[in-house]
Structure formats: C-alpha cells, structure tokens
C-alpha cells in the first residue's frame, strides 16, 4: 500500500494531483493539476477502488483507516474535477473560477492541465496550449464521472454539459489520411470527405472553441498542414474517442 500512501501525500488540498511529485523544477508545468494521459483520473480510480471494502483490493487486507482516507481523498478529487470544468458566459467567454459569474456560468469540458491554485486552463509543453480538450482527456473525465454511483445533481450536470459540448464541436465530413509525401516520408493530412466518420480535435482554442494545432514554436495554427513535420506526425491531433462517450451516455438515457 506504499503506492496508495504516495498518492495521498501528493494530492493538493483542493483535491488536484500534479503530473510529478516531488515537483520537477526544470518543468514548470509538472506541478499543475494534470489530466493529461489520464493522470488524475487514474489516481482517483485507484483511490476509489481501495476505499471500497469488498472491492478488488480486499484480499490485500486494506486497513479501515486507510480506506477512509482514500474515500475522503477520492471525494475531494472528484470535487476538484467538477471545479476545473471550464465555464463560459453567454458569449462563450471563459470565466474565472470562484467568481459570481463563474457560479452562474455554463459548463463545457476541461483542459489538459489546470493551474494548481486558480484552476484556470494552463499550458504544458510548447505545443500543449491552454485549450478545451476534445478527443483526449475530457473523454476519460466524463467516463470517470459516469461511473459515480448515485451521482449528485452537480455530477449529472457536469456530464450532460460535457457530452453536449462534444456533440456540438464534432468535425464533420473530415478524415485523417496517412500518405507518403513528395519527399518519400510517411505523413498525415486532413481531407474533406463527405460522410466521413465524426472526428474531434485534441485541442480547441479558448476564444472561439475551434480546432487548434501547434508545434514546438508554441504558435497556434488553424490547420494541421501548418504544423511542422515533426509534430504533425509525432502527436495525436484528432480522433473519435468522444463518440464512445456520447454513445454510452445516450444509451443510458
């Protein structure tokens, strides 16, 4: 159970989890609340499962005291997830966490990373800018929330708003093609294709909620073709994972 104790130690008071613990000074983003690669989601799943008396860890003889600590940490983390969900006003402008406007704002989805204090969307690596997460981390978060037994009204609203946001930001009639470019290298590009399966971008800009791409220059691009070869082919920019989440949600209604 040393790993569980480690998770309990690294959790912030607001319920968030950093990417690394202890913090890596050379990487400023390592201490931010991290949903990237499902880091926080997986941590919460572990705490949730340990907290269950007759769960998958029962044969390990988890002490009651530790189970209780895990339950408290899980609930605190779940609240942090809800608090990090980006909220906007009627004009689609991102609202600051904790303000009166934020309390009345409309829930959307999440960023890959959020500030460990303000909970605002923040950047990580040069090509991971503050943004709405479409095909990536938002999916894992929504699945975590849909797994909550006897969900509160807040959890239910968070899921509903997240799914609706994904449904309204699908990239229609677009397909990802893998091809050999003029230099004889394997490459990727987005093409218009009538009737193509729905796709979602990994990132959507915070101003207009439109698909956004980037490379190590840190300059946001509107088109994948504008990203340099190395990052264009070295990162997953689009995908259809949200469809599974949408289908699961709609199938339970």
Question: Where in the sequence are the language-model features?
Answer:
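Active-site cradle of extracellular carbohydrate-active enzymes
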Residues: 2-40, 47, 61-131
């Amino acid at each position: 159970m040393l790993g569980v104790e480690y998770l309990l130690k690294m959790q912030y008071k607001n319920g968030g989890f950093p990417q690394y613990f202890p913090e890596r000074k050379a990487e400023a983003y390592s201490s931010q609340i991290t949903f990237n690669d499902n880091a926080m989601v997986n941590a919460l799943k572990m705490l949730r499962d340990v907290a269950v008396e007759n769960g998958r860890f029962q044969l390990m003889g988890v002490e009651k005291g530790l189970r209780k600590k895990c339950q408290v940490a899980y609930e605190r983390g779940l609240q942090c997830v809800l608090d990090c969900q980006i909220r906007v006003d009627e004009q689609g402008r991102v609202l600051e966490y904790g303000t009166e406007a934020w309390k009345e704002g409309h829930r959307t989805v999440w960023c890959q990373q959020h500030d460990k204090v303000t909970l605002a969307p923040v950047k990580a690596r040069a090509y991971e800018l503050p943004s709405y997460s479409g095909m990536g981390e938002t999916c894992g978060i929504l699945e975590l929330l849909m797994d909550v037994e006897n969900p509160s009204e807040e959890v239910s609203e968070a899921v509903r708003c997240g799914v609706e946001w994904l449904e309204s930001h699908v990239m229609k009639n677009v397909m990802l093609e893998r091809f050999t470019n003029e230099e004889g290298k394997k490459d990727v590009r987005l093409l218009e294709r009538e009737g193509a399966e729905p796709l979602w971008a990994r990132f959507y800009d915070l101003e207009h909620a439109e698909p956004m791409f980037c490379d190590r220059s840190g300059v946001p691009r509107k088109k994948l073709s504008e990203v340099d070869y190395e990052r264009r082919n070295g990162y997953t920019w689009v995908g259809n994972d949200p469809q599974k989440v949408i289908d699961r949600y709609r199938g339970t209604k």
